[in-house]
Design a protein with these regions (language model features):
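Short consensus segments that form the blades of beta-propeller domains
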Residues: 91-96, 131-133
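Bacterial N-terminal signal peptides that target proteins for export
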Residues: 1-11
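C-terminal motif of bacterial Sec signal peptides marking the signal peptidase cleavage site
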Residues: 17-22
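Acidic/polar, low-complexity intrinsically disordered N-terminal segments immediately downstream
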Residues: 24-87
Length: 182
């Protein structure tokens, strides 16, 4: 075979592999979204969660009643949120940046399992440290490499967008007097 024929054969082989590998029986994006929505609805039902509309949440002073297991569904971000405590301090104002230490539990609703957490075992001594910035009412943040379990697990300083939603409603600060809650 000449070099030209070998090159042509290899290009044809690569094209064929690409074409046939793109045609698979895997679930479509629509199927994935449906499966995700079903998992969320199942979780809400099994946990007895009362879902508030944003208007109800705002009428209640932007708080949820944890005794009633209330969560608010935020339409714009597709986030279900429960505010356990608003925190002490103040909201992060437009143009400000704050260092925020946080604890979390990440669940995989599709497998009904705890994905990761820094609230038990060895990781209880690790708080995730992130820098949060409010730019004209839009929050962005990044984890500090080496000071975040999320960074260690996923290899990225990007903070999931759902983690930023509560900053519109909560205060950030250190306790200054007895009774202040973080």
């Amino acid at each position: 075979m000449t070099m030209k024929k070998i090159a042509y054969f290899l290009m044809t082989l690569v094209a064929a592999v690409t074409i046939f590998s793109s045609c698979s029986d895997d679930e479509t994006y629509a199927d994935q979204k449906k499966r995700e929505r079903n998992a969320i609805n199942r979780y809400i039902s099994e946990k007895g969660i009362k879902v508030l509309k944003e208007s109800e949440f705002e009428a209640n002073g932007c708080v949820t009643d944890t005794a009633k297991n209330e969560f608010v569904y935020l339409d714009d971000s597709n986030v279900y949120m429960q505010i356990i405590r608003k925190g002490c301090g103040k909201k992060i104002e437009k143009g400000e940046t704050a260092t925020v230490l946080c604890r979390y539990e990440e669940y995989n609703l599709l497998t009904d399992s705890l994905q990761s957490t820094n609230m038990i075992g060895y990781y209880i001594s690790v708080v995730d440290k992130m820098n949060v910035q409010n730019t004209s009412g839009t929050f962005t943040a990044s984890f500090e490499a080496g000071e975040s379990l999320m960074y260690s697990l996923y290899g990225s300083t990007s903070v999931p967008s759902g983690w930023l939603v509560p900053f519109t409603y909560i205060n950030v600060g250190r306790p200054e007097k007895e009774g202040d809650e973080i």
